[in-house]
Amino acid sequence: MEIIIKYRSLIALATVAALLFSVPQTALATPDIGKPAPAFTGTDSRGKTVSLNDFRGKIAVLEATNHDCPYVRKHYSAGNMQALQRDAAGDGIVWLQIISSAPGLEGHVNGREAEALNAGRKATPAGILLDPKGNIGRQYAARHTPTMAVIDATGALAYYVAIDSNSNGHPDSIKGVKNHVRAALAELKVGRMVSVAKTRTYGCSVKYVN
């Protein structure tokens, strides 16, 4: 009996340890509003090195994306994301897509494929950062796609995480809801602090490399 109890205790401890070590790094370090946004350097879809510091002095939007995710498709099929990108570009805002899906997992693409996807859906980000190792995604604690981060002209994180106020995956659910990214950009444009600076994440889990 004593042996069985000890054996079960060992199994329980091993299970707890496995769960602890399996917790993704994305759960550990959510960036802070008002603090410097996590600096990064990555490679874009054309092989160019891109750093966040390249855009100091400009407002920037980071869009963690996965074209196979229904929540991402919701915003692209309705033209919502493209409209945001166009309006942002018109205001001199830099919009960067970040693709953190690991090779062999849902949403992974190479540079040519990423550009073809955007051309097909008329998306116009300023750049596409390929992040197959998940380094940039983890820096921003991106748990889901889409994850949105708005960085002000001083380099501080001004808004973080959900694109809007409705976590329904159907395209019709966009109508009549508050778009948090659009609202944040409008406030920054006139020199105001973002009134709703942090929201609850929703979407598909980011397909990080193990």
Predicted regions span which residues?
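A short beta-strand-turn-helix
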Residues: 40-60
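Short, internal strand/loop/helix patches
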Residues: 115-152, 157-158
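Short active-site neighborhood of thiol/selenol oxidoreductases, capturing the structured segment around
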Residues: 53-73, 185
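Bacterial N-terminal signal peptides
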Residues: 12-23
